[in-house]
């Protein structure tokens, strides 16, 4: 894929605009509380967007639709325990954190136990968050590497450097505002992609037909019990029980002890605002995740009629074609093209049968 002038303009304006807006909005962060907690003046809706923006990244844009494309909608069950966890946190953790005027979740452990406990948990958080952030930075870097052919190492440094600029200079408020913008940009882009996928379907094939094709292919399996003829399948990762139980405890730990989330709702004006932001997060996250996964199902329907690339990373594909594996790769690509043609025939026949 070659970037046109319009693509470059959108990319540069988005990157510079997000950074400049975040730094501008952080001008009031003149003290420690302002830097880390935005002076505890955020309204609930802004905290909500910040919480959801923390969860939304290039990983969301790339992996969630891909998950539905390959495995269907059942991944949404993973979030069924989230609303229950938000209720528990709103009743227990939020009042405690606000009453003690904490800066971090780990500060409570120091007051309850000792400084060593706080240091250990803080270290574990920084280690896990460092690994997670590295993956989140790598994802957009991989996209730019694929589309533009940039060196992946320098692309990672470039993307990470931009994050460091507004995070270090602006503090919590800069992060909150930039995450809100990123959240809006990511989800608008995803729904534009879904609209484009439906509009690009063959003539006579619409949104309903795309859902039928995805459904007949087993992609709209929203609720699964894990039950088979031989009993319960313990190897089934995504079902209603793993979603309710596992999702509940995972959300409880993530939103209750992970500073990347705790630090968001501690910026709220008061305890009530924090509670509302968490409860609203539990309310809107499940349907929003449902829509994100639905995009993957629409992409599955789209690629049932049109040829999907055998290898999406064009930069690495050129490396393969220039290597000793070029002949083998061309043979595999030819076989893949034949499968795509057969898949299109079956999708067309199915679409006609559903009329």
Label every model-predicted segment.
Residues 29, 58-61, 90, 94, ...:
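Alpha-helical transmembrane segments of polytopic integral membrane proteins
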Residues 19, 23, 87, 91, ...:
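Membrane-embedded alpha-helical segments of multi-pass transporters/permeases
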Residues 24-42, 63-81, 88-117, 263-277:
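Flexible loop linkers connecting adjacent transmembrane helices
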Residues 1-61, 167-170, 189, 193:
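Membrane-interface "cap" regions at the ends of multi-pass membrane proteins
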Residues 18, 52-53, 73-170, 225-233, ...:
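Helix-loop-helix module between adjacent transmembrane segments
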